[in-house]
Amino acid sequence: PLSQDHFGSAFSRYLSNNQVEYGVGFFAPAPSSLAVVHFSDAGQPEYSLYRQGIADRAIDASQQIAALPAQCKLLHLGSLALEPEDAPRIRAVLHAALARQIQLSVDINVRINAVSDVVQYRDFLREVVSLCQFIKASDEDLQLLYPQLSTSDALAALRATAPTALVALT
């Protein structure tokens, strides 16, 4: 869900102004998540991510499944949503979507500094990848997901995890 705070209200207005239906049906009292980006001297982005006690995690699987539109054909998720503590809920939603013939898409966008357990996060992200028909990954994502492998071997490992998926490498 979106938060009742200023960010959640602004995002809700943006969705409404762009004819996007907010299907959850409630706004959470918890705050919006926050990402702060800083650029290093080398011009590389560095992230500070605030993901604990936030609105978008204040939902259960039945509420998320009920919010899927009847005509939904594709469910996209980003890896910031894949906190290992939320794995049972997310797993239930993904399997319910697949049971309804909804295709799954993930931007793996690996951010290991934003999760409670890096090993569980990587394992769960690989599990999610195995369910998806569409996957977006960068070379940096692959190196973070498979730190012991070269980029080409990491891509091969990703392809082996989801052999029929369409993969976009950026």
PLM ranges: what are they?
Residues 14-16, 22-23, 44-170:
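Ribokinase/PfkB-type carbohydrate-kinase core domain
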Residues 1-34:
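A glycine-rich beta-to-alpha transition motif near the start of alpha/beta enzyme domains, typified by
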Residues 30, 41-43:
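Short strand-connecting beta-turns/loops that link adjacent beta-strands
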